[in-house]
């Protein structure tokens, strides 16, 4: 697998996520139903953070696909394992987990709102936790290269920005406050 494959995957699935969100918001007369029991005061804090998270995503994206070479991305490895040239595969795994879970979240939530069930709740929590874990995973993957690759700390900062949204606000706070 090469980096171009990951690049095109992200560019194919990313717009589908935006379409799924647009479609999800259009599904209800009052789209605020997606907030569940999250207090309005917290919504006004979470929504701006979504833009911070998007900026963090773009910081990482720039490093992975424009700033670093194919070989530099291939050199990325987990902190607990040696470099083996499979950084692109690891990156694909993280992007697939993050993007595919992001793609199905709003539809799962819509189905849950229309007909609450334990299976629906578990599915929503699972995709949010998976997306949250993947958002942290980007920083974990880049961490061993933080002194070696130019701009690695920028990618780590981007992952942290994204992770605050996906792990804290979505997978933890929203899940605890939605009203399952």
Language model features: what each stretch is:
Residues 133-180:
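Terminal transmembrane helical module of multi-pass membrane proteins
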Residues 1-14, 44, 86-91, 148-160:
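Alpha-helical transmembrane segments and their helix-start/interface "positive-inside/aromatic belt" motifs
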Residues 27-43, 109-121, 174-180:
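Membrane-interface interhelical loops and short amphipathic "cap" helices
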Residues 14-28:
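Alpha-helical transmembrane segments of multi-pass membrane proteins
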Residues 69-134:
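Membrane-proximal helix-loop-helix units in multi-pass membrane proteins
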Residues 55-72:
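Membrane-water interface of transmembrane alpha-helices
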Residues 7-10, 42-53, 120-134, 156-162:
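Alpha-helical transmembrane segments of polytopic membrane proteins
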């Amino acid at each position: 697998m090469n980096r171009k494959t990951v690049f095109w995957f992200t560019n194919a699935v990313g717009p589908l996520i935006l379409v799924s969100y647009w479609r999800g918001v259009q599904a209800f007369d009052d789209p605020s139903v997606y907030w569940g029991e999250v207090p309005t005061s917290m919504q006004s804090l979470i929504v701006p953070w979504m833009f911070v998270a998007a900026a963090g995503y773009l910081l990482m994206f720039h490093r992975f696909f424009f700033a670093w070479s194919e070989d530099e991305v291939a050199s990325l490895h987990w902190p607990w394992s040696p470099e083996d040239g499979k950084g692109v595969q690891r990156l694909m795994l993280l992007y697939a987990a993050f993007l595919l879970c992001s793609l199905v979240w709003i539809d799962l939530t819509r189905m849950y709102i229309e007909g609450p069930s334990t299976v629906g709740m578990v599915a929503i929590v699972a995709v949010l936790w998976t997306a949250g874990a993947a958002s942290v995973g980007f920083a974990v993957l880049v961490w061993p290269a933080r002194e070696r690759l130019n701009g690695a700390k920028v990618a780590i900062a981007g992952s942290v920005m994204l992770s605050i949204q996906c792990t804290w606000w979505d997978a933890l706070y929203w899940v605890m406050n939605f009203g399952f």
